Amino acid sequence: MNNSKSDFTQGSILGKLIPFMMPILGALILQAAYGAVDLLVVGRFGTTEGLSAVSTGSQVLNLVTFVVTQFAMGVTVLIARYIGEKRPEQIGALIGGAIVVFAMISVVLFVVMIVLSRQIAVIMQAPKEAVGLTSVYVKICGSGIFFIVAYNLLSAIFRGLGDSKSPLIFVAVACVINIVGDLVLVAGFNMNASGAAIATVAAQAVSVIFALVLLFKRKLPFKITKKDFSINRHCRRALKVGLPLALQEFLTQVSFLALCAFVNRLGLQASSGYGVACKIVNFAMLIPSSLMQSMASFVSQNVGAGNEKRAKKAMFTGIGVGLVIGCIAFLLIIFKGDILTGIFTTDAAVVQKGYDYLKGFALETIVTAILFSMIGYFNGHDKTIWVMAQGLIQTLLVRLPLAYYMSIQPDASLTKIGFAAPAATIFGILLNVVYLIFLKYKKRI
């Protein structure tokens, strides 16, 4: 690992932030492609019921993945903090404790997804024609949850060390395996949604093995001993940072699952169209998401080094970068959204339903650039309780109520339901601006 490249406390902010962010963005793009391939192949070679099953089931898998990623953010932030404070010897105990905690989380998720797979499909209000396939998809993915959790923990460790390239390699390996698996199992053996789920699990397993081999071969600035594998004080400190983020992400993703349930009530075509639109949405959110993840490490290092002015400047730099790209994404979705949805399915009705949702959602690509850069800044300061609180307020006061209200109107449409997302984000920006002013007034940042 090149120390000068992973030292964010000096040099050009843009010159350090962009090179660190790009591999994170690349990994997120491949992760989105990873999920999109399932829909693309099932949409082309499977059935409409299979497409709906993958759409609904992947929402559940996204919830698990995003929550684990945010939980692991505590590990990323604390590793970066120790590096900024020039105390890398503390990292071994942190990672050992994190392995214990994430192993326990994996066991719980495994049991829930295997035993309650059908109940999950019903709660998601999967169309009755697709309940069985959705249940199978969730169960198969649940069987491989250990690999999904392990991948996210390993990626968090590398990002905390200032290395964002290795996670890109991990997910690239998984993406290739998943594409091959989908083509063989779905297109070749006509296994529909089940084939897509098996390919997903196999790809994650290979990726984790590759990541472990890479980790053991490299020279690290710390050692991990047997006594480190316990819930120690370093681990508890990381949990204090990561737990609020995980809870906030869980409730946010639950709100999107509720949104999926609202849409499923509008019929099979709306369900499939929404699922296709969500894959495009995932791609559109990659820039702000990569900014948020990189911002946390960048800010945390500078906080550890006592350089608050540079940390705040990094936030505004991230906002500027995100806004430029967000505007481009907005125009692409508004004017070419039907072409984008048409990539995933040949069903004209499903294409139109997906485009309808994107029209309402489009503004989110712009406003999220602001919100996520601010959240990354607060995460880097360990202000994760606030990040959780503002997320809950957005979800409970704006996103869910507005989406539900739009879904029960006589003229309910996916466009109106889609607008709930940017409306909640705009409200969140206002909350965060007020909080930032409050902290400045109190001289706490």
Q: Model segments located where?
A:
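Short alpha-helical transmembrane segments in multi-pass integral membrane proteins
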Residues: 1-21, 79-146, 188-243, 299-364, ...
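N-terminal transmembrane alpha-helices
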Residues: 8-40, 44-45, 59-73, 78, ...
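Interfacial/gating helices of multi-pass transporter permease domains
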Residues: 19, 42-62, 94, 129-133, ...
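Transmembrane helical elements of multi-pass membrane transporters/channels
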Residues: 19-38, 140, 174, 203-207, ...
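Helix-terminus/linker motif at the lipid-water interface of multi-pass membrane proteins
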Residues: 29, 33-52, 121-128, 184-191, ...
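Small-residue-rich hydrophobic transmembrane alpha-helices
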Residues: 51-111, 148-167, 273-331, 335-337, ...
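Hydrophobic transmembrane alpha-helices of multi-pass small-molecule transporters
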Residues: 63-66, 178-182, 207-212, 283-286, ...
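Short runs within selected transmembrane alpha-helices of multi-pass transporters and secretion channels
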Residues: 72, 141-159, 167-175, 196-209, ...
